[in-house]
Amino acid sequence: MARVTVEDCLEHVENRFDLVLKAAKRAHILELGGAEPMVPRDNDKPAVLALREIAAGYDVTREGQEQETEEVDVDRNVLAETAKMNKAVASQKESEV
C-alpha cells in the first residue's frame, strides 16, 4: 500500500480546502456503502480510499452529485408527505373539538 500525499492529490484538485471537502464527501459515501471504491480497497479506511481515488485522478464528485440529487428529490417527497399528514391530523383534531 503506497502512502498518499497531499501533493499527489493537489495535482487533481485546485486547493487544499477543496481537497478536504471532496475527500470528506467521498469518504462518507464510501462508508455508507453508497458507492464502490474506484481503487483497490487494500484494507484502507474510507478517508484513505477517498484520498487514493483523488490522487489517482478519479472524479470523486460525479457519483456524489448524482446521489445528492436523488437525496434532494427523496427529501422533497418526504416533506410533501409529512405536510399532508400534518394537515390531516390538524383537520381531524378540529373536527373533534
Curated annotation (Swiss-Prot):
One of its GO terms (molecular function) is DNA binding. The keyword Transferase applies. GO terms for cellular component: cytosolic DNA-directed RNA polymerase complex. PANTHER family: DNA-DIRECTED RNA POLYMERASE SUBUNIT OMEGA. The RNAP catalytic core consists of 2 alpha, 1 beta, 1 beta' and 1 omega subunit. When a sigma factor is associated with the core the holoenzyme is formed, which can initiate transcription. Belongs to the RNA polymerase subunit omega family. This is DNA-directed RNA polymerase subunit omega.
